[in-house]
Amino acid sequence: MADLQKIVDDLSSLTVLEAAELAKLLEEKWGVSAAAAVAVAAAPGAAAGGAPAEEKTEFQVVLAAAGDKKIEVIKEVRAITGLGLKEAKDLVEGAPKPLKEGVAKDEAEKIKAALEKAGAKVELK
């Protein structure tokens, strides 16, 4: 039992970067992926629910890619978010990035349509 407590104490003292490195090393050693484990753990609860899923009311608008017409996309991002030119340009060039969060479905669809018309690739999550 003392060995387990020492392991807990050692793990608790790790920095975030050290913990991430440890996770990566364990994934390589054991031949697993932490993302796959989360997906597998979430799947049984979703499948066993049986009740109809509630319709999502809030969406996140994610700029997936700027496309060929970057200037038009930057203009549209500025109009939607109210960001300055530099901030909008950085957001567009850093895609994929969330553009707006907690948006109603109809507003999210309007934003998506406007950005796609400007040449961007957009995802609603």
UniProtKB/Swiss-Prot annotation:
Family stated for the protein in its record: Belongs to the bacterial ribosomal protein bL12 family.
CDD domains attached to this UniProt entry: Ribosomal_L7_L12
GO cellular component: cytosolic large ribosomal subunit
GO molecular function per UniProt: mRNA binding; structural constituent of ribosome
Domain of life from the UniProt record: Bacteria
Protein name, entry field: Large ribosomal subunit protein bL12
A Pfam family assignment: Ribosomal_L12_N
Annotated InterPro entries: Ribosomal_bL12, Ribosomal_bL12_C, Ribosomal_bL12_C/ClpS-like, Ribosomal_bL12_oligo, Ribosomal_bL12_oligo_N_sf
Quaternary data: Homodimer. Part of the ribosomal stalk of the 50S ribosomal subunit. Forms a multimeric L10(L12)X complex, where L10 forms an elongated spine to which 2 to 4 L12 dimers bind in a sequential fashion. Binds GTP-bound translation factors.
Protein purpose: Forms part of the ribosomal stalk which helps the ribosome interact with GTP-bound translation factors. Is thus essential for accurate translation.
Keywords annotated in UniProt: Ribonucleoprotein, Ribosomal protein
A GO biological-process term: translation
